[in-house]
Amino acid sequence: MALAPAAGQRRQDMAQDSEIARGDGTARSARTFTGAGQRGTRPGRLWGWIESRTGIRALAYAVPEHANTIWYILGGITFMAILISVASGVWIAQYYNPDPAAARESVLFIQNEALLGDVMRGIHIWSAYIAVIGAVLHMVRVFITASYKAPREVNWLVGVGLLGLIMFGAFFTGTVLRWDQEAYEAMVHNMELASLLGAFGGFFSDAFTTSVSMLPRLYIAHVSIVPLLLVFLLIAHIFLIKYHGISPTPAQEEAGEAPGGKLPKERQTASYATHARKMLGYGLVVLGLAGTLAVLLPGAIGAAPDPAMEITKPSPIYYWMYTPEAWFGVNGVLYAAIVFFGLLVLVPFLDRTPLRRLRRRPLMLGLGGVLVVALTVLTIITAVTPVVSHLE
Ligand code: HEM
C-alpha cells in the first residue's frame, strides 16, 4: 500500500521534469511517447508500469527541431546497422571454426547447412556495408554543417576513431575470416603492413607468437577486441553528443541564435522520443534491406587459398587504397591511410573561424572537393584495371 503513492508521485515528478526540459511547458511529445493518452486501457496500464519501473520517459528530453530530420539521424541509422551486424554475427559465430584447417569449410557450412545460416551471414555482411556507408554519410553531414567546430572538436576525433575502427578493425578482420583466396591475400597484406610499422606492428604480425596462428588471433580481434573498443568509443561519442547537445544549423549559428554553439532551451521544441522512434523505424528498414540483399546477393566464398598466387582485389570499400598500392607497393596502402585519416584529424584544427555555411568556408570546400574527387578516381581506376601482383 505504501509503495503505490510513492510510484505515482515519482511518475508525476518525471512528467514535470520532461515538461521543464522542453522549455515551452507543453510536453506534447513526451505524452505521445509514453502513451499516456490511453491511460486506463490495458496497454496503457502496461506502458505506465514500464515507465514507472524503467524511467524510459527520461528519453523524451528536448532537442532542436532539425535533430529529427534524416540528416541528423544518419548517426543513429549507423548505430542500428552496427547492432544488426552484432546480432547476426553472434548467430553465425555458433557455426564458425577459426582453425585455418577448418575455417573455409565452416563458412560453407554456414552458407549451405546451418539453420538460417545463409540469411544471417548475408545480413551480417550487408549490415556491415550499410554501417560503413552510413558512417561516411553521417561524417559528410557533420562536415557540411561544420558541426566539428568548437566545442565539438573532440567528438569529431572520436568519430574519426570510430570510422577507422569499423573500416580497418571490424570490416577488415571479418574479410579474413572467410579464409578463401581474397581473405588469405588480405591477411598477407596485414602482415606486410605490420612489418612496415616496425615495433607498432608487432601485435599484428605472424612473428608475435608461435603458439597461435594469425587467423584465430584475427578472429579474437573480430569478436572481442574490436567490439570492446567500439563500445568504448560509442559510449564516448554518445556522452559528448549529450553533453554538448546537437549542434545548431549553420543558419541559426551565423544568426547568433546559439551562444556557445548550443540552441537555448526554449528553442529546443522537439523531443528525443521522436528521434528514437525514427531511429528504430530506419533500423527496421536497414534490417529489411540487408535481409533482401542477403537473399538476392549472397556473400561469395572463393576458392581455398593458394599462397603462390595473387588473384583478387579487395572489397570495394578499399578500392581507393588498391591503386596507390599498385603505384608504390604495399607502402601505398599506408600512404593512402595516413593522408586520408590525417586530413580528417586535422579538419577541426584547420577550420577555426565561426563561419558555418560551406560556401563561406573555401578551405574546407576545397579540401572536401579534392578528397571526394581523389577517392572517386582511385576507386574507378581500381574497378577498371586488372588484378596486379603487389606482394613479395
Ligand atoms: C560508428 C560510427 C558512428 C556512429 C554510430 C555515430 C553516431 C552518432 C549519433 C547517433 C550522433 C547524433 C546525431 C546524428 O546522428 O547526426 C552523432 C553525432 C556526431 N558525430 Fe557521429 N557516429 C559515428 C561516426 C562518426 C564519424 C566518422 C564522425 C566524424 C569523423 C562523427 C562525428 C560526429 C559529431 C562531431 C557529432 C555531433 C554532431 C552535431 O552535434 O551536430 N561521427 N554521431
Region locations from a protein language model:
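Membrane-embedded alpha-helical bundles that constitute the cytochrome b-like, heme-associated redox core
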Residues: 2-327, 332-392
